[in-house]
């Protein structure tokens, strides 16, 4: 079936345009920064020019690198394992108490998926992703007793292992968050980061200050009443964590690859409509950022955007044809304040989002929406966005194929990542399996002490490869029979392609007002 003339023109424009290098905005800043530190666009020193401005290559003909890869490939050492972890040494009394209390906890909960429990310091259950609510009181009681036994000794319990499970604990007064996971190669730090994200999800609906004030005045208050409206988002987040979604795993965003001139056109449109009360405006499609303009000194964190996208794209609360105006806390930006969010879906999967610090400017935001939506419609940009997203999602961009089955590139410079679309021909190999592999590889690379490391691991019929540097992490999956020399050649081929397409794959500048 021949494509329509409209889609043909879009396809021709998308595929045949040369890559344009966009200039740096004078007032631009990094879009996202994992450390949530306000910073200007990074400068590149002469010594760091090769690392930061281009992607280095592995040299397969250099003997020491080839030997290094060969040694790694035949290394039989066990992978990173989670072990018992307490912030300070525990006394015998605390250990004995734990042994007595462990029998009260049903660890069958975590045989297949990770279980998350949240309860107040008074022992009242707040949330869990357990289907059978009847087991919560005994579980919560045992866990609270274990945690309290360490608090009495002025020690902080962070994680411990028992039977075939790992238990991690995050204390966020007045809440305790607990994760129960099957024994896994994921580190305790990785599991704690999941609990921290769950805590941030709670704060999106009720600020830390409001929660503390409520419990100070009414110590036995049932917090479920306070965060009840957030429960559907917590459940969805638990599902995504169990599916190893890449955004929370990497603490980075995945922008939609676009020609830089097209992205600039959209950004300039948003920049023309910036009322005084506006903090930021951005367009997103299917949970991927298209473009953004923001106030000069405002820095948004990947996790804050992820939690906002979660509520917009993964639930039915906002994904409709209505306009929505709701207060949302961005916990990493400020856990004690709300930003008022205006959201409107331009079509089923494409949303326009504006944020303001003022609650009474709905009609001002509505006026901006009307102007932006009309111009996007007049230029045919919405259809072009939909086409670009569909092509990127369904068309694998893999210069290393067929040697390399799939890859993930994470840019530390931009706090963004790119991974190509993938069609799964093997029934037992799906998106969750793929993401779980990347989660394990990233977790191990993240906890390496040196800034440069190479790791190759054979797992059944797969060869798993990680290359971590100060500026990027690269993970890929190949056939276990692939030689190291062939693998290196194809890794370099992919990295050269990423270097050429960098301004298309990543948002390198963002406009400020």
From Swiss-Prot:
Transmembrane segments: none annotated. The keyword Protein biosynthesis does not apply. GO terms for cellular component: cell division site; cytosol; fungal-type vacuole membrane; multivesicular body membrane; nucleus. Pfam families: Fuz_longin_1 (PF19036), Fuz_longin_2 (PF19037), Fuz_longin_3 (PF19038). It is found in: Endosome, Multivesicular body membrane; Prevacuolar compartment membrane; Vacuole membrane. It is a peripheral membrane protein. Residues 1-26 are annotated as: Disordered. InterPro entries: FUZ/MON1/HPS1_longin_1, FUZ/MON1/HPS1_longin_2, FUZ/MON1/HPS1_longin_3, Mon1. Keywords: Autophagy, Endosome, Membrane, Protein transport, Transport, Vacuole. One of its GO terms (biological process) is autophagy. Its main location: membrane. In complex with CCZ1, is required for multiple vacuole delivery pathways including the cytoplasm to vacuole transport (Cvt), autophagy, pexophagy and endocytosis. The MON1-CCZ1 complex acts at the fusion of vesicles with the vacuole, through its regulation of the SNARE complex during the coordinated priming and docking stages of fusion, and particularly at the stage of tethering/docking. Belongs to the MON1/SAND family. This is Vacuolar fusion protein mon1. It comes from Schizosaccharomyces pombe (strain 972 / ATCC 24843).
């Amino acid at each position: 079936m021949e494509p329509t003339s409209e889609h043909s023109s879009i396809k021709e424009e998308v595929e045949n345009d040369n890559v344009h290098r966009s200039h740096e905005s004078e007032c631009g800043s990094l879009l996202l920064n994992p450390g949530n530190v306000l910073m200007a666009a990074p400068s590149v020193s002469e010594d760091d020019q090769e690392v930061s401005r281009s992607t280095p290559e592995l040299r397969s003909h250099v003997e020491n690198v080839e030997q290094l890869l060969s040694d790694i490939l035949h290394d039989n050492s066990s992978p990173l394992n989670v072990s018992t972890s307490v912030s300070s040494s525990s006394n015998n009394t605390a250990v004995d108490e734990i042994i007595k209390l462990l029998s009260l906890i049903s660890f069958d909960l975590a045989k297949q998926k990770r279980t998350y429990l949240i309860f107040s310091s008074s022992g009242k259950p707040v949330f869990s992703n357990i289907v059978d609510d009847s087991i919560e009181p005994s579980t919560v009681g045992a866990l609270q007793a274990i945690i309290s036994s360490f608090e009495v000794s002025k020690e902080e319990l962070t994680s411990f292992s028992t039977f075939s499970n790992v238990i991690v604990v995050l204390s966020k007064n007045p809440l305790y968050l607990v994760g129960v996971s099957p024994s896994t190669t994921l580190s305790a730090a990785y599991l704690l980061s999941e609990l921290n994200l769950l805590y941030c999800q709670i704060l999106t609906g009720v600020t830390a200050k409001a929660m503390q004030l409520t419990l100070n005045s009414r110590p036995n208050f049932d917090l479920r009443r306070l965060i009840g409206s957030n429960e559907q988002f917590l459940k969805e987040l638990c599902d995504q964590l169990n599916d190893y979604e890449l955004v929370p795993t990497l603490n980075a965003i995945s922008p939609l690859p676009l020609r830089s001139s097209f992205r600039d056109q959209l950004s300039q449109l948003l920049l023309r409509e910036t009322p005084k009360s506006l903090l930021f405006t951005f367009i997103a499609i299917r949970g991927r950022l298209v473009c953004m303009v923001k106030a000069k000194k405002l820095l948004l964190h990947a996790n804050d955007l992820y939690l906002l996208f979660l509520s917009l794209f993964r639930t039915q609360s906002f994904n409709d044809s209505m306009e929505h105006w709701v207060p949302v806390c961005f916990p990493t930006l400020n856990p004690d304040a709300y930003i008022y969010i205006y959201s409107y879906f331009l079509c089923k999967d494409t949303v326009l989002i504006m944020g303001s610090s003022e609650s009474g400017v709905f009609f001002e935001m509505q006026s901006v929406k009307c102007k932006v939506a009309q111009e996007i419609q007049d230029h045919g940009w919405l259809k072009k966005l939909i086409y670009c997203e569909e092509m990127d999602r369904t068309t694998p961009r893999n210069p290393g194929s067929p040697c390399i089955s799939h890859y993930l590139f994470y840019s530390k410079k931009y706090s963004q990542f790119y991974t190509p679309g993938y069609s799964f021909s093997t029934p037992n190999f799906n998106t969750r399996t793929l993401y779980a592999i990347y989660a394990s590889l990233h977790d191990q690379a993240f906890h390496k002490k040196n800034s440069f490391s190479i790791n190759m691991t054979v797992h059944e019929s797969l060869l798993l490869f990680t290359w971590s540097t100060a500026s990027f992490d690269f993970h890929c999956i190949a056939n276990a029979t692939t030689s190291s020399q062939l693998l290196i050649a194809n890794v370099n081929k992919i990295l050269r392609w990423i270097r050429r397409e960098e301004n298309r794959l990543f948002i390198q500048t963002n406009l400020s007002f």
